[in-house]
A protein has these predicted regions:
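Subset of outer-membrane beta-barrel
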Residues: 66-364
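Cleavable N-terminal export/targeting peptides
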Residues: 1-8, 12-68, 346-364
């Protein structure tokens, strides 16, 4: 979910009230698009959009910073968006995303993210680790998160509840080499030299799941809203609500899975609704609708491998998924869409202790 707020945008904000507001397009970007709407040459338009993206990234006087990364296949790893979901099964999970947003537009967001979490035996819960790198225009964002989810005792109906907390280190940097679209030197919001800053923050999440039947969760990111050092930027608090339900259509062979994710910073709200079908616990395909932004078909495979040899046993699950967001916003004339790839490895290796037996020679 990418949104940039510029405190100096007054006339453009009033103009936007006459149109349907798209929470995925910043106000400076929208203003630039409208100003260039009379252009007929496609190549010029793409260049202008790229300039607008760079401008939007840098207008940050007492503004909220870069939003959290957006992923279409978020339902493949709920713990990436709610630390309370970490360790909701007995496997260790390692998941990687790559997302190329608005393909073909120079300076558009490119996001890489790794999320790992594992259940442990020495405490009632799980630990998580998340790394992500986000590049957009002349702006670069890096986040490192370490988290723990405490698992409450299983409820009488078989549901499990996790309460989690992330501690994060957030780094942001700007490159001053950019193309201005107006008299930028008179605007103190725009840095004239390269700049960078860091901040620490926390995330919080509560998650409930009943086996493979349903789940629900509520989480917050940037809870502390700590201003970044050397930059006049405050990452804004985000709220996430997620929920899902699985409907068996043909026993366990065919399962209809529904997922919903609502994201808001109490000013702009975005909604993701996904429906997909899992066949034979191996092949899945579905469709995601994102409010005011895109329709995204997605598909993937998952393969489970169980093995036992002597005193050792293992269980592994491999997943690969891909999606393509077909843009439905104002950018649909300038980009074919957004490509995303998801890869996951979940595993558990066990060694059964050898039972020592003692015999009395008298009874041999």
């Amino acid at each position: 979910m990418f949104e940039f707020r510029n405190t100096r945008s007054t006339q453009s904000e009033r103009q936007a009230l006459r149109h349907k507001e798209n929470p995925y397009i910043s106000q400076p970007l929208r203003s630039c698009l409208e100003a260039q709407s009379a252009e007929n040459q496609r190549n010029k338009m793409i260049r202008n959009i790229s300039i607008c993206l760079a401008f939007a990234c840098l207008t940050v006087v007492t503004a909220f910073g870069q939003q959290d990364p957006q992923m279409t296949q978020w339902f493949n790893d709920l713990a990436a968006f709610n630390i309370g979901a970490a360790g909701n099964d007995d496997l260790t999970h390692v998941n990687i995303w790559y997302r190329d947003q608005w393909s073909g537009v120079n300076g558009a967001p490119v996001t890489t993210m790794l999320n790992a979490h594992t259940k442990v035996d020495f405490v009632p819960g799980a630990f998580g680790l998340q790394l992500y790198q986000d590049e957009i225009g002349q702006e670069s964002n890096t986040m490192v998160k370490l988290g723990y989810a405490y698992h409450l005792p299983t409820l009488t109906n078989g549901a499990h509840i996790g309460i989690g907390l992330n501690v994060s280190l957030f780094s942001k940097s700007f490159d001053a080499n950019w193309i201005a679209v107006d008299d930028w030197q008179s605007d103190p919001a725009i840095p004239q030299t390269n700049g960078s800053g860091t901040s620490t923050d926390i995330d919080f999440g509560v998650f409930m799941r009943k086996s493979n039947e349903y789940y629900a969760g509520l989480s917050m990111t940037h809870v502390a809203e700590v201003q970044m050092t050397s930059l006049n930027i405050i990452p804004t608090r985000h709220y996430y609500f997620m929920g899902g339900y699985n409907y068996p259509l043909n026993g366990e062979e065919l399962i209809l899975r529904s997922n919903v994710l609502a994201k808001t910073d109490l000013n702009a709200t975005a909604l993701d609704v996904n429906v997909n079908v899992l066949w034979n616990n191996f092949l899945w395909g579905g469709l995601t609708w994102r409010q005011g932004d895109a329709v995204a078909p997605s598909a993937g495979i998952q393969y489970r491998l169980s093995k036992k040899e002597g005193i050792t046993s293992s269980e592994q699950v491999f997943k690969v998924g891909a999606s393509f967001d077909v843009t439905t916003s104002e950018l649909n004339s300038y980009t074919p869409g957004t490509a995303e790839v998801f890869v996951s490895w979940a595993f558990k290796f066990l060694t059964t202790p050898v039972e020592n037996k003692y015999a009395n020679p008298r009874f041999l």
